[in-house]
């Protein structure tokens, strides 16, 4: 479990330095936006805690990977796992809210990744800088089908074919653009 800091504790560059000596610096870009999409859980003993939504988690995974791609490969794999499986989370909303995705070339995973993008977009909408940065990262990673470091980092253990991972990223970007 990760404990995530947020709420006005970062500097102007979106970073925090951990006490006591401020030696460990961590980016918290997107944390405030992710905190607005948390889900509250209550344990039988009454203990309450908030968990970031899948939409907020994916946004944070993309930011973390982009900031340190060689050190954050696990974030790319985690994003891939979400993209591959989000159609199961979307469930019936595919037919009730996203039926425009049902075409002759229908593919559950691609539709799920696009729905995921549509669900991330409202988190990005209020923050021009964050929205621009995330869209820019995805545009860069989907600009050349033969060269996407993110699709490569997502790894074959998540989704075997590089081309498929690239398609999922394209669907994610398209979904975000659908709602911006």
Question: What are the residue ranges of the model-derived segments?
Answer:
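Compositionally biased terminal segments of proteins
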Residues: 1-180
